[in-house]
Every structure is written in structure tokens, then in C-alpha cells.
A protein has these predicted regions:
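Alpha-helical transmembrane segments and their helix-helix packing motifs
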Residues: 1-262
Length: 262
């Protein structure tokens, strides 16, 4: 936590969650849009590192191992997010929800925050994806690696896509909770690097990250997914992320805090 307590109690983490949630919910729309846009840019920088490293490693080993190695690089995106204080749509399944639950924010403000953050995240992704697709900006092997990431998303049936999205929502919301609990930037950086690998290693279906993967592949012509299919995959990711984040983390933390406070 911000006071440097390395052994913060759940009630302390919840108190900080609610305070931060109230602050986020009262920001002006342009502030929400700006932090969301930067969050999208941060994710794409991490994905750029992933596809470049994966493409390079794929020239000397099998694609599966290349993907695992490349996934190690994605954590830098979450480092940018948590240290630079940009925001991702899935970060807001705990903090502002806690404020609304505690009576210190409205559902309307929460809906506004979710929609603006997600939209600006996606705009940030699209900007960088368009640049990466320009011939010569990154090696062709990197674009091919993006195509493989998109193929993983494309090949999942609905049950697998939803299940993967639920886990992604759980992981990101748990990341938010633990990041509030730790007392130093160094610990947050280490946590971000670990969570980044946990997201990319199994190619979890994350509404922002997966959309970025599909956009790079679509803009560069390394996938045959069309607009309708990409949109359906995105909606599936959003639904699963919400279920995992709200249902498995936020709800259980509320029960935990209420139980321990008597």
C-alpha cells in the first residue's frame, strides 16, 4: 500500500480501493479518455515487444517455445500501466466498483467510466496497430507472430473463448487488488512482469490485449478474420472478463472484508 505496509490487512486494502475508486469516478471525461488512450498505447508497446521477440526466436526453435519466450516480454506493458498510472478497462472491475458498492459513487458514473476507458483503450490499440502494419516498421516475422496470436483467438470455440476470458478477468482484477496491497514500486513492477506472462503465456482472452493482437494481424494481413468476427470475439472477451473480475475477485473480496470486519 501507499503507506509502505508490507502486511496490509484486507480492510486496509478495501479502504484504499474505495478511496481510489471515488477519485476515479469523479474525473472529467477528457481525463478518463486520456488515461484510457495511454493505456491502449502501453498495451501495444508490450505486444510489439512480444511479437518481435517471438518472431526472432521462431527462427531458431519451434513456434510453441518461441511463443513462451516472447510472452515474457509482455509484462513491460503492465509496468507502464501501473507505474505510469494509465488505465485499462479490466482494471476497473474492482476499484470503482468498490466505491459504488460503498455508496461513494453512482452506477451512472461507473458505466461512463467503463465505456470511456474501453473505447479509448481500443483507439490507442488501433493507432499503434496501424503504424506497426506499415511495411518495414517491424520485421515480417513479427507480423507473422501476430498472425499466430490471432489464430489462437480465432480457433477457440465459444466455450473456450468464454472460459479463457473469465480467467483473464480474474487475473487482472486480482492484479489490481494485490498492487494496492504492496508497498513499493519495485514490488509492483515484479508483480506486473509476472502477471504479464500469465496473460500472454496461455494467450488468455483479454478484452484489450486480445483485441490488440487481432488488430495487428488484421491490419498487416496475417489473419483472415473480418470485422464481424473480430467484434464477436471482442464482445465474448468483455463478457467473460466481467464475469471473472466481478464474480471471482470483487464479490469474494467484499465478502472477505465484511466477514473480517465483524
Amino acid at each position: 500500500m501507499s503507506n509502505g505496509d508490507q502486511h496490509a490487512q484486507p480492510q486496509d486494502i478495501w479502504r484504499e480501493t474505495v478511496n481510489e475508486g471515488e477519485r476515479r469516478l469523479t474525473r472529467e471525461p477528457r481525463g478518463l479518455a486520456a488515461t484510457g488512450l495511454v493505456g491502449g498505447l502501453d498495451v501495444m508497446l508490450g505486444l510489439t515487444a512480444v511479437i518481435v521477440l517471438t518472431g526472432a526466436v521462431a527462427t531458431i526453435t519451434n513456434p510453441e517455445l518461441a511463443h513462451v519466450v516472447g510472452s515474457l516480454a509482455f509484462g513491460i506493458a503492465l509496468v507502464f500501466v501501473v507505474i505510469g498510472r494509465s488505465e485499462l478497462f479490466t482494471e476497473n472491475f474492482l476499484v470503482p466498483v468498490g466505491a459504488v458498492y460503498s455508496g461513494r459513487g453512482s452506477r451512472t458514473a461507473l458505466a461512463r467510466m467503463w465505456s470511456l476507458t474501453l473505447l479509448s483503450n481500443l483507439v490507442g490499440l488501433a493507432i499503434v496497430a496501424a503504424i506497426l502494419s506499415i511495411d518495414g516498421v517491424v520485421p515480417q516475422g513479427a507480423l507473422d507472430a501476430a498472425g499466430e496470436l490471432a489464430k489462437t483467438i480465432e480457433d477457440r470455440n465459444l466455450a473456450a473463448a468464454l472460459g479463457s476470458a473469465v480467467i483473464a478477468g480474474l487475473v487482472m482484477t486480482l492484479f489490481t487488488w494485490v498492487a494496492l496491497a504492496v508497498g513499493s514500486d519495485g514490488a509492483r513492477i515484479a508483480l506486473a512482469l509476472l502477471i504479464g506472462f500469465l496473460l500472454l503465456g496461455p494467450s488468455l482472452n483479454h478484452a484489450v490485449v486480445s483485441f490488440g493482437e487481432m488488430l495487428i494481424a488484421a491490419f498487416s494481413g496475417t489473419t483472415d478474420m473480418g470485422v464481424a468476427e473480430i467484434a464477436f470475439k471482442e464482445v465474448t472477451a468483455i463478457v467473460g472478463n466481467l464475469a471473472g473480475g466481478l464474480g471471482f475477485v470483487t464479490a469474494t473480496r467484499v465478502v472477505q472484508v465484511r466477514g473480517e470486519s465483524g
